[in-house]
Amino acid sequence: IDDASLNQIVDNIQSRLEELGKEKGVTFDVSYDNCNADASVMEQIISDFQADKVDLMVGVATPVAMRMQSATEESDTPVVFSAVSDPVGSGLVDSLDAPGANITGTSDYLDTSSIMKLIQAQNPDVKKIGLLYDVGQDSSTTAIQEAKDYLDKEGIEYVERTGTTTDEVQLAADALIADGVDAVFTPTDNTIMTAELSIYEKFIDAGIPHYTGADSFALNGAFVGYGVDYANLGQKTADMIADILIDNADPSKTAVETFDNGTATVNTETCKALGLDFDTVKKAFEPLCTQVNEITTAESFDEVESK
């Protein structure tokens, strides 16, 4: 899928491999393709990789990683996944410490309860939270259930709305606004991420802050993105690739790399449009975060860096 977080991961994998190649005196021949969430295109891309007899496959995000795993079960081709939220729950690995098969990688597991606490810190009187996600995204399943469990314990009402396409997500956003929610939560859901630029103004106009599981959502207009550093995740993925290809590390015995959550990225334009003061928001968030970053709305991180 063409979204800011996944593009950032790919860019950092490639740049880190170039760096490692120079350090180790080797050249990594990288073939890159993007199926844009089209299952038939994904099948063809993986088939082409197999026909080219690649030494290793890299699957960015859960659906691609799962298909690569099944496609390579009868071969010796290792798979390294990147940005898989729940590697065990999705069946990719037996455990995080010992994957058990010819696959390992990096996880962007989301600490959902921490985002719920951010919502409460910003609005202690919150009474109803909207849960916006794609029911078909494996990466969302665990996080949404964790959100429900947390909100049940806190006695906070929630309403779920889902969508599998941008058009459906827009309708789901409209429904949440009509539901009168005080805030909206979305985990690391690629479908919603792809649609964020088309819905963030709806939430702003309704005065509803959108809390999300990645900084790329905030880049595309959401109020807050919270979670892991995807640039670092991409670099660590490249390190694992090099360990396997150069140092003969065994994927089945190579622990899945996990990362600390804790970085909250606030879109200052959205913050202002919602009638909130950034300094006040930052002060409320800081006890719950390792750092609070600022960002403004753009389509890609490259645009932000070039400003």
Predicted regions and their residues:
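Hydrophobic alpha-helical segments within soluble ligand-binding/sensing domains
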Residues: 86-128, 228-249
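Short beta-strand elements in bilobed, periplasmic/extracellular small-molecule ligand-binding domains
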Residues: 19-42, 102-103, 148-166
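Pocket-lining segment of extracytoplasmic ligand-binding domains
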Residues: 138-210, 214
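Extracytoplasmic "Venus flytrap"
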Residues: 1-20, 31-40, 136-140, 189-194
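Hinge/cleft segment of the Venus flytrap/periplasmic-binding protein
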Residues: 243-307
